[in-house]
Amino acid sequence: MSAYVISELEVRDPIGIETYRSIAAASIAQYGGRYLVRGGAAGIAEGGPPPKNIVVVEFPSMERLCEWYASPEYAEALTVRRSALDRRLIFVEGVPPQR
């Protein structure tokens, strides 16, 4: 069953975010992930103001997602992330395919 990373973020360092994106994208692909949403326009139908940016990444499973997040490949991106952006990161499991 697919699993998703939902990231609400605000960029603090425009140069650092490009470095982070490059490293993160390579590590995501290596673990079978793919971007579904990457900073497109967002609107709010209910609730508070929208986050500055939203990113959604799909992985084949929650196990694979957790392997990616704990991986040495992504650890390098996390080092850059700490100074490049603030974020809230959510992991969520998808629903089984409809039959």
What are these regions (language model features)?
Residues M1-I54, F59-A70, E93-R99:
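Short S/T/G/P-rich N-terminal loop/turn motif that feeds into the first structured element of a domain
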Residues M62-I90:
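C-terminal structural segments of small proteins and small subunits
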